[in-house]
Amino acid sequence: MLQPKRTKYRKQFKGRIKGVAKGGSDLAFGEFGLKAQEPNRVNAREIEAARRAITRHMKRAGRVWIRVFPDVPVTAKPTEVRMGKGKGSVEYWACKVKPGRMMFEIDGVSEELAREALRLGAAKLSVKTRFVQRIAE
């Protein structure tokens, strides 16, 4: 699963996801893509599950690019533990996704196959997404 090799700090504040994606909102590598429509935190497990669903449907034809990386540590305290006594330990890694962010890109397959593969991948994610396609010039 995806996670940073090392970080400057072990734990982070929760923060908020404001505004729309400035960068990473256009197709950069592939012909087809999956674009986020709402803000949310997407964890590493969801990204990996979506990647597996996409590659499995494509039957190893074409190429997949993952355009998001889980770099935010999410902490949690154990169950039935009283409040206080410090912040909980890191449970999983997540990625803060803003609306308009390109999450996955694929190339080397037909539009029908790409649309279905990305639909299956989108079902694994906790954000509403949209299928996008490069405009022919």
Swiss-Prot record:
Q: Could you name the domain of life of the organism this protein comes from? A: Bacteria
The UniProt entry's GO biological process terms, in alphabetical order, are: translation
Keyword rRNA-binding annotated: yes
- Which GO cellular component terms are attached? cytosolic large ribosomal subunit
Stored InterPro entries: Ribosomal_uL16, Ribosomal_uL16_bact-type, Ribosomal_uL16_CS, Ribosomal_uL16_dom, Ribosomal_uL16_sf
User: Sorted alphabetically, which SUPFAM superfamilies does this protein's record hold?
Assistant: Ribosomal protein L16p/L10e
Keywords assigned by UniProt? Ribonucleoprotein, Ribosomal protein, RNA-binding, rRNA-binding, tRNA-binding
The GO terms describing molecular function are:
rRNA binding; structural constituent of ribosome; tRNA binding
Q: Does the keyword rRNA-binding apply?
A: yes
The protein's job, in short, is:
Binds 23S rRNA and is also seen to make contacts with the A and possibly P site tRNAs.
HAMAP family to which the protein is assigned, alphabetical? Ribosomal_uL16
Instruction: Quote the subunit structure annotation.
Output: Part of the 50S ribosomal subunit.
What family does the Swiss-Prot or TrEMBL record give for this protein? Belongs to the universal ribosomal protein uL16 family.
Q: Would you tell me the protein name for this molecule?
A: Large ribosomal subunit protein uL16
